[in-house]
Amino acid sequence: MSISIFVKTKIPHYISTAIFSAVILGISQQPIGFGFLAWIAFIPWLKILVKLRDFKQIILSFFTFGFFYHLITIFWLAFNIGTNQWVATVSMVSTVIFLSIMILPGAVVWYILQKSTTSQLFAFPIVWTVLEYFRSLGTLAFPWVSIANTQLSFIYPIQIAEYTGVYGVSFWILLVNIAIYKSIKSKQINTWLITAGIFSFPWIVGIIIMETEELQNNDFVSTAVVQPNIHLSEKWEDSLKIQHVNTLIELSTPSMKENIDLIVWPETALPVYLLKSGRRYLRNIREELKNSPSKILTGIPHYDYIDKEYLSYNSVVMFDRTELFGIYKKIQLVPMAEYVPLSGVFPSLSDLNFGQANFIRGKEYTLYPLKEWSFGAVICFESTLPKLIRQFVLEGANFITIVVNDGWYETA
């Protein structure tokens, strides 16, 4: 069946099919989450791509695909209430354009290999996966849009990430698209059998992993996640701080009485400098913990005063009724939200005010003890970074917790 029935329009096919495939891939991501569509999303676009010979058309097609896919995937960035609507929208569109440009090396490789369709199709999943890897590195890393994320609902195939990382899942999705495309073109049973094998392999591996993994009775940590639902317009009001702290204590009291191992509060849950001027709040919380072995993990604002300069951090701390177990300072900050890029080189950039914070990047991979294990606590965006999570594991983390403040997006 001709793809043209889906895209009868005056827009060139190399643009319209790029949009069509981008939309299909976009709705396979959360929050819509039709993850199964990722297995076929690239096929309409590939049918047109293999016919293109003009460099400009290939570049435009790749950019168009990237623009609409990323727009659908991260459109919600424009609804950040931490800044004005204009800044939030410009920030979102700029991010979409930046991410779309980052896939253009794939267009260059596609053009170079145009004499061999087989080479193009073979290289496509490799190049795309490599680009995903590089997109996860550096201060401008943004792996949030990895196509592997489309498979969150499929517990079995994503088990291969234990051995391949998230990139193996992305590669598998791309390979399935290529295999189905080739099978449709060849119409040979052998090709379809190979495609079935490619598709089934991670499912089989995942089932084996899940079914053979044996958990001991003590291989668990009892956890309570507390969501105070405090609006950002009220959170930092001085007159309401004690009320907010009391809300968190009240919501956590049942878990304390049940001796839950770990009680998790959100990112910057406490609107006070808990380890500085806010120690009276820490005493209040510990008073409630006096008869409980529970530990509380919470996000806090924090600062150090070094060389007559205040250095602010987005941080996490864990404590119980008697002991403080160290502080983690967020390592991977969000550009233009938590700091201004290059402000370390040009300090005057920190004076720009787009509604962003001016945090300092942490350096230590802090681990927290819990029963016989250790764990790392990452903050919000950091949870998307494979390299950072891997480093926590290399440092000795047995598991990872994530604290996040989605109050920036009221309908999150």
Question: Where do the model's predicted regions map?
Answer:
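Short, conserved active-site loops that position catalytic residues or coordinate cofactors/metal ions
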Residues: 29-44, 69-76, 227-229, 259-273, ...
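A generic secondary-structure signal
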Residues: 112, 250-254, 391
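Membrane-interface segments at or immediately adjacent to transmembrane helices
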Residues: 153-155, 199-265, 272-287
